[in-house]
């Protein structure tokens, strides 16, 4: 009755009454008895029954996941099959399926068109504010801001007393260069635009009136186009003069003199100028001649029998020719000292001064001197102060940039020569050809040739080679007959072999300047290159510290590598320190 009164609102059934019955708790004696009792052994049938009862109460998640995955896979398979069956587009469609019929855009087309017009007007206002690019403007529209942007774009700097002319925007716009010479440059030789050093040098080195052109001190990297930078002003000046007959050329000698440190560079410049003269089709019979060591005096005499307008020579050989009275320097109007820093490094400073003393003093006022260098050392500055009159200083890039095109520098700690050879073979295969391998001793050239000639076409270049052998080696590398040149420092300057992919310093140079000019054989004219240097651990620590700093500071491709192992061996301490947080 008590229960019925408490739950009188509930409808009671027999089942609910049965469920409400309270079972009597297990007797404590039975619990103690079951605890002390031993294990109960179950038969096989009993164990199977217990397992089945438990399995019925649990959900197998693995089975459920497998079922779901099977369903999804079946759906994907069916979709894939339907896609395979409908590879071709079906153009026979029912017009009733057109979902755009009766489409009403949320934005009114008229309003949308107004928005677009406002956006266009905003672009026009921005363009009016910023102005057109200097490339899009006419020459008369250029202002100081445009010229400043152009100089920054090509990394051109210039300084000097007096007015400095603006850089060339193209070959023909300012009419500084003769029209037919411009046509030879663009159509005959395929030079679409001037390089940075040409842009700033040419307009300032060519006089617009009959006055003597300005002296130039130029700082630029190898492969930057210096040859045309001084050749075009020379040719423009010669073009303004009357044609000279052969006997007058022989009597007065050349009108332009170019001094260079190596015979290879002299021949290269001569070929480049004569190429331009051939494309120019100038009627004045202008010609360029190079005289270098390795040719006999009779050969040089035969070369100079008809005189020349432009003479390219190394200092030592030119002195020999002057002593033998094969040429005179009475009428030099244009003097070029190319790679002046290298000529000084090679000990040609006294020879240069001796040659300059042969130039007649009364012609000094009418002579233009152009000096080009990769590095502006104190010796070069001394030469410039002594022989240049109020020069215009022009440079392309920073001091570091003047020594580095797009070169990735890699340093390897190799150990002995056998390990070096193993690295060398891998680098030649991995980094591409043609390649130049620099060594310090000519005996090493023979040793390497013996071990590499089975896989590569090798030519060598060192001091024991005759002039004909040197010229043949360079020509083979240029033509592709050979793909590896092994050379001492004699080839580090002046060589212009296109598309050199790899430079290997098999033996580190004794001077750091030589290292710079070795690696400058690759990465020329805007192309990328790789320079690999092998170190054994026996090199001069001070030299390697310079190398480490240069590799760190000059990294245009952000791929340079100077291994920590080398840094530790040579005691090179990083300037940065890990911060300690307490």
Curated annotation (Swiss-Prot):
Keyword Hydrolase assigned: yes
PROSITE patterns per UniProt: DEAD_ATP_HELICASE, HELICASE_ATP_BIND_1, HELICASE_CTER, Q_MOTIF
Binding site for ATP: 220-227
Residues spanned by motif Q motif: 170-199
CDD domains: DEADc_DDX23, SF2_C_DEAD
Primary localisation category: cytoplasm
Coiled-coil segments on the chain, per record: none
Localization in the cell: Cytoplasm; Nucleus
Biological process annotations from GO: mRNA 5'-splice site recognition
Pfam family, one: DEAD
Entry keywords, A to Z: ATP-binding, Cytoplasm, Helicase, Hydrolase, mRNA processing, mRNA splicing, Nucleotide-binding, Nucleus
Disulfide pairings: none
Catalyses which reaction(s): ATP + H2O = ADP + phosphate + H(+)
GO CC field: cytoplasm; U5 snRNP
Taxonomic superkingdom: Eukaryota
Catalytic activity, EC: 3.6.4.13
Helicase ATP-binding domain location: 207-394
Role summary: ATP-dependent RNA helicase involved in mRNA splicing. May destabilize the U1/5'-splice site duplex to permit an effective competition for the 5'-splice site by the U6 snRNA, resulting in the switch between U1 and U6 at the 5'-splice site. May also act to unwind the U4/U6 base-pairing interaction in the U4/U6/U5 snRNP, facilitating the first covalent step of splicing.
Domain comment (free text): The Q motif is unique to and characteristic of the DEAD box family of RNA helicases and controls ATP binding and hydrolysis.
Subunit structure: Component of the U5 snRNP complex.
Name of the protein in question: Pre-mRNA-splicing ATP-dependent RNA helicase PRP28
Organism listed in the record: Candida glabrata (strain ATCC 2001 / BCRC 20586 / JCM 3761 / NBRC 0622 / NRRL Y-65 / CBS 138)
Gene name for this UniProt entry: PRP28
């Amino acid at each position: 009755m008590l229960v019925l009164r408490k739950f009188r609102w509930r409808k009671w059934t027999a089942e609910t009454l049965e469920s409400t019955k309270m079972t009597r708790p297990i007797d404590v004696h039975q619990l103690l008895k079951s605890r002390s009792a031993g294990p109960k052994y179950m038969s096989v049938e009993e164990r199977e029954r217990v397992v089945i009862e438990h399995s019925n109460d649990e959900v197998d998640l693995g089975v459920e996941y497998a079922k779901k995955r099977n369903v999804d896979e079946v759906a994907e398979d069916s979709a894939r099959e339907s896609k395979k069956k409908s590879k071709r587009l079906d153009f026979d469609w029912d017009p009733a399926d057109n979902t755009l019929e009766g489409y009403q855009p949320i934005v009114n087309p008229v309003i949308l068109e107004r928005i677009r017009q406002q956006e266009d007007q905003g672009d026009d206002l921005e363009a009016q504010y910023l102005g057109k690019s200097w490339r899009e403007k006419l020459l008369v529209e250029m202002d100081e801001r445009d010229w400043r942007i152009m100089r920054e774009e090509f990394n051109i700097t210039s300084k000097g007393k007096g007015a400095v002319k603006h850089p060339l925007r193209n070959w023909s716009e300012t009419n500084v260069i003769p029209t037919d010479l411009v046509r030879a440059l663009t159509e005959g030789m395929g030079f679409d635009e001037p390089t940075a050093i040409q842009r700033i040098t040419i307009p300032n080195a060519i006089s617009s009136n009959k006055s003597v052109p300005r002296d130039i001190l130029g700082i630029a990297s190898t492969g930057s186009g210096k040859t045309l930078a001084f050749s075009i002003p020379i040719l423009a000046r010669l073009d303004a003069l009357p044609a000279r007959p052969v006997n007058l050329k022989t009597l007065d000698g050349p009108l332009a003199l170019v001094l260079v440190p190596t015979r290879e560079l002299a021949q290269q410049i001569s070929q480049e100028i004569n190429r331009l003269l051939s494309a120019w089709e100038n009627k004045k019979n202008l010609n360029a001649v190079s005289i270098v060591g390795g040719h006999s005096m009779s050969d040089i005499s035969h070369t100079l029998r008809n005189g020349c307008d432009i003479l390219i020579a190394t200092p030592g050989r030119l002195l020999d020719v002057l002593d033998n009275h094969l040429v005179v320097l009475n009428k030099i109007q244009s003097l070029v000292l190319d790679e002046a820093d290298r000529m000084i490094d090679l000990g040609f400073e006294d020879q240069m001064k001796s040659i300059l003393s042969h130039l007649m003093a009364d012609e000094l006022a009418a002579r233009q001197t152009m000096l080009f260098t990769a590095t502006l050392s104190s010796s070069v500055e001394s030469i410039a102060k002594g022989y240049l009159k109020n020069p215009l200083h022009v440079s392309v890039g920073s001091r570091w940039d003047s020594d580095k095109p797009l070169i990735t520098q890699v340093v390897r700690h190799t150990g002995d020569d056998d390990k070096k050879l193993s690295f060398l073979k891998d680098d030649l295969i991995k980094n591409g050809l043609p390649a130049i391998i620099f060594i310090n001793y000519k005996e090493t050239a023979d040793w390497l040739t013996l071990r590499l000639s089975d896989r590569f076409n090798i030519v060598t270049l060192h001091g024991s080679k005759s002039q004909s052998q040197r010229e043949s080696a360079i020509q083979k590398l240029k033509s592709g007959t050979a793909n590896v040149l092994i050379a001492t420092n004699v080839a580090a300057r002046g060589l212009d072999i296109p598309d050199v992919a790899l430079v290997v310093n098999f033996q580190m140079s004794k001077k750091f300047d030589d290292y710079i000019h070795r690696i400058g054989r690759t990465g020329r004219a805007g192309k990328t290159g790789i320079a690999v240097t092998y170190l054994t651990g026996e090199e001069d620590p001070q030299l390697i510290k310079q190398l480490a700093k240069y590799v760190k500071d000059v990294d245009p491709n952000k791929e340079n590598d100077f291994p920590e192992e080398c840094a530790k061996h040579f005691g090179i301490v990083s300037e940065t320190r890990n911060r300690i947080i307490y």
